[in-house]
Amino acid sequence: METIRLNKAEFNNVLQMASQMAGVSKTLPILDNVHLRIKDGTLQITSSDSEVTITKGYQLLYNTSEDCDIIFNPKSLCALLPIIADDEIDVENNGSDILVKYTNGDMSLPTFDVDDFPILDLDAQNAKSVTIEDCAGFAETIKDASSFIANDYIRPIMTAIVVHIAESGIEIYASDANILYFSKFSDKGNQDEKFILLPAKAIKPIYSLLKYSSDKSFTLLYNDTHAKFVCDGGSVTTRIMEGKYPNVKSVIPQTSKTDIVFDKKTVQDAIKRVSLSTNESKLGVFSINFDEAEISAGDADFRKVSKEVVEANIQTGQSLRIGFNLQKLSRAISVIEGPKITMCANDKDTATLWHNSDDNHTLVLVMPMRIE
């Protein structure tokens, strides 16, 4: 085989991204490897665990007259490429191994039978599709949602992130039963309604593909069993989780008696400091009155008590005393963008809704804790 010259940085970026699913499967040893294909001047690398497959490719700078199909374990090469100084490397396929050459040395890696490598894909001709604007925004939204999936083996459906496609738009949500993350991501959807339940392990590959894409939009293909995200010379195909996700929209309060505006950073910092005195329950109490809120916590066993006062602007309603798990509340607030956040509440025993004070497209519902 002829020697193929590759730009090291470009090849390394593609290899690192595309090899994410290699070694995830514990049942098929062949899936410890990646599939590298060169065809018609395009290099493409694929890894899979049989349920999630990521593929990334790019157009080669140097023309090659020879196509290539090889399977190899990427672990050593992923470690080598970032620590060699060369701008370019040479790759030779010798049949039973590949030889990667750089200025001061080389690395030989065994190759395996291409036919043994299973590829998970989706038949585009029999799939529905929707074009979604803002690759990076979608990536950040599913990353935020992934912070609130449940770790629940009894109800595995709650470990999913839901992408709800409807004619009215696209919604993304997830819940661990204590916190609900809900984003009205787009007003443009598809007339064929679909609830796509993404498994947690698909989120990182999808995020990597979309976040660093040079494309502004991506295509989402889907059928009853699979979803495929396509952009910028790459794709992630994942099995869709089976089952029916709870109707989370039914628990989102439509009205509130008390709306309170906080400075996000101020309240985050106060929660962080007060949390140092909580007991195992992580209970903290917000006592809101007029134009301020006292955040307090204590641990009677160790005689620790902390409290801080922060500015609070009551937009509607009146004073309120309500308890939260401060650790979970801090996590909920962290995914809300903007300098000001609003808490919408009805009483100390029902769910509160938190959102950007200037935008309610992203809502985080937080359940309170009982206080005496």
Where are these regions (language model features)?
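Structural preference for solvent-exposed beta-strand-turn elements
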Residues: 1-372
